[in-house]
């Protein structure tokens, strides 16, 4: 076919000149420019000029001067050809139609056409197409089979299309469209296929083909003009026909011949259908004509018989002219009357009854009288019709045979109705037949769309799904029939459910994507297979050659006669020899055929040489392949690590973690929870969204070592490292109730030294790391007989958690320290010292109190360079490790110093303080002196100090005891509570929303100015903020406070008002609650979370992954392996060693992954990203340390935990956290000790106004409220009501109550105004959206019926009455 296309291009290249370029050019050109030539070389050999073309156009214009539209259509044809909208055949057909009947114009147009395209009169009158020969169809099918021998699906699809057409399941248009799609890239086949189409479709398909070719050539920018290709169409057809007959393949099977018959059938299809329609139409017309003829014949017979019966003389000759005219007019009137009756009668049944009556009368069944009675029953509703019928009946009596006329009328009408019903039935039958045919065609079409397609190519995404692997085939999918299937097989075998494959890079391995290690194994297998096939092939060829050579040597074969080399060598043997000699392979095989005796010894030697060479090569490669298998076998089985690494970074992002808990919150938000929150007074139910158990506490030590080691690698400074480790040890592990590390335990530096031979250069690092959390984690104070697991942390500096250090080292002398503290805090004004006990002054109960806030240490505490200590009375500094030791220390000091000691205060963290110096801070007048505070210290007011954990004894004799126990502590606490005041038991006084945070003690130049700002803010908080009660956070949300004031209010309790339900909901003694933001939530999640995401993949985070490694290492399989190999170290220690090697950079990721696989197995894929996870965790710790808001949350946590266990309320803590975080996410993190569990809940951001709850009040405020503000009896004279005297005079003689009742008639009063009062400042403020309501209805106007004079008199009377009342 390529040669034919080349010939086309070659022959078409001579038509190059455009038409109409100048008048001087030859007559071969057309006056139409561009688009290619219509022809070259006319009938006459003379040169044609442009003048000839213009002359022809003028002649056409003159011919159609009265038909201007035809001339315009001719010009449009030429323009379409110029624009390549039509081809030469289209031009010729349209010109023939235009110039039909004008032969001179047709002959003139032939001069512009190429040779072979002339329009003849025979063509104009009767164009016919050459009959396609059967051999041409066979040749075309063989050509398709040869063309698509490598793609049998196209060939089979083509045969199936022809088969469907032969069965009348497809029409010719569908056949052509599908074949066009099939031969889209083979235009020559499609062009040849159009020759076999019927005449009605061939021109259209030919034009469509040429347009598609033109588009393709235009896109390519090259190729022969389309019209020039059409000029040689007939010649090419003749050449292809001759060539196809000569090259016809006789090996076509019988099925192909049957399919080829459909090609010839296409030419007869249209003619058969037309003939069939014509025959059906003629048969229907014939039936109608026969019915009419029967009626006429019946009428003539009846007429003759009636004449005989009446005695008239019958004659066969034609009647007279007047008689014929009378009968004709009578018949016409009768038919018109019947039509009128049919129109007037609405019912078809009545009309049929009328005709039956006439029919019975014509047959002689009834008489005239009976006919009139029956007709009157039918036409009785229409008197005019009945009268006309009677008149017509009377006129017809004189005419020969009225019965014949009635018979004709009834028969004609009945015949027409029968013909109508017959035609209707025929149409219905035709429609039913067409519907059946269309249904069969539709069924075949539905089957046809699946023919030629494998199941893998079907789109079954919308079909019913059984399992992830099986889909139900569509109901119209053709199920192949199965032979020899028994009943047992039919009961269990499946024909309708198919396995759907999805996703792969090729068709060889569809169900799972290969990883790189599998690719290596597959390549090894391919190499091994190829080499084995080479060895087997060369071995087989050598064996055959050796056998043939032995036969030749033994002279058991004769080369004369019928010796064939194929009898001794297989095709594979010969192919092996050809490949062995490369380009000379065919020559070698020819030598074997010509002279096997001389060629075989050389070939056999060569074969054995190659066999030995390839055998040695395989032995060498076996070593390489074994190494590849050993390295990649376990890796190839790990299909999860590839996807896990991709998803792990996304799953560990803060956005993904926050989104996960939000989704869980939305799912768990039920209507019951909403009702519970409403019934609890806007308190949210405690329903955790995430819960995690800590099964192995030993893992915490490993996590601490990993974090400490990573901080040395990641953090840039030692100070930053220290802050991160303090946050981990003093907050995170305390929240999780991790036991404190004892002094002398193995430090991280020792672990790293033993595992990696690395040592830290600083000698002090070991000591400081051992004592990182001694202060905070060893001290637990016992109250009321129970051990309270308080946080035991102090608040000082920026955050007490981060700046606390327990090294116990002393870098400054005590005197220097005291001097420095005094000098630092000496600049504070007097106003700053009076904040803590301002409320006590107002109540008149000035008591001796010492600020015991956990954010400030007693005198003798050093907060420089992270050193913290406590000074006892003897001047020595130390740290008490147990509460009992603190009590013993207090007792010993009391015994030694006696009366010199004022008070011993034991803080919530177990530290002792000497208050003798604190007492000295009071001046001689008994007034409060300056209270020393550290930078950022929290200073609760004096009236709420009873909520903190204190130990004090006002009477020295009560403290003179030799032993102190937990019971003694409880008694002392009770005494302290009794002596602190009557309001010690009141709940909620520790939660004032406007108590000041505390002022920073700074040595900067602007310290006094900042101090003044803080004092101003504190004063404003006392006077305004406390008056808001539970709504102080609402005031802040509305922006009534400046931003600086909000900062100072960040860690203060919200309100003194606490819900009654909150008194019952105390915090459990073995649990710790922390309210944090997104940073803390992500920190705890990275520490330990195992959640199931949407892909059912465990997202183990640090704790869970280390725990999984330890679990796998201690599994039964690992124990069995260790029993076999007694020399192998502990698998978990080996894993930790590999992890530390990865962290310090001495091992690569691939080595670490191989080590994990060797230790744990394929389940170790979750450990491959541990380095990134630890890095992310340390970065999160750094973010928490550096963020101001996170530090404030830590301060608030310490502040709340510094209270006594009975004084801590979760609702107050939550409201304080809300003030800090505003509209940010708030998380409730609760850790319990037994069992060790972490619960996380995302709280609702409630902005609604909470209800006010009943609370207990201070006695002083109660006395003021009841005795002064709301008192009805007072020494002052009450003001008289302002009443108009003229109104009072109208009710003379009535008492005050009656007057009030009389005056309030028709008045509506609603007292709804509310006000609230601050318990500290007694300031009153009104509640918004509340008011009092007073309304008096107007009197109705009197009737207007009264006269104007009467109204005037009434008005005058009222005026005189008013004057008399005023006197």
From Swiss-Prot:
Residues 33-42 have a biased composition (Gly residues). Its main location: nucleus. PROSITE patterns: PAH. Keywords: Nucleus, Phosphoprotein, Repeat, Repressor, Transcription, Transcription regulation. The keyword Repressor applies. Residues 968-989, 997-1016 have a biased composition (Acidic residues). GO terms for cellular component: nucleus. The keyword Chloroplast does not apply. Residues 46-116, 130-200, 327-396 form the PAH domain. It is found in: Nucleus. Residues 14-44, 212-322, 417-446, 786-883, 912-946, 958-1031 are annotated as: Disordered. Acts as a transcriptional repressor. Plays roles in regulating gene expression and genome stability. This is Paired amphipathic helix protein Sin3-like 2. It comes from Arabidopsis thaliana. The lineage of its organism: Eukaryota, Viridiplantae, Streptophyta, Embryophyta, Tracheophyta. The gene is SNL2.
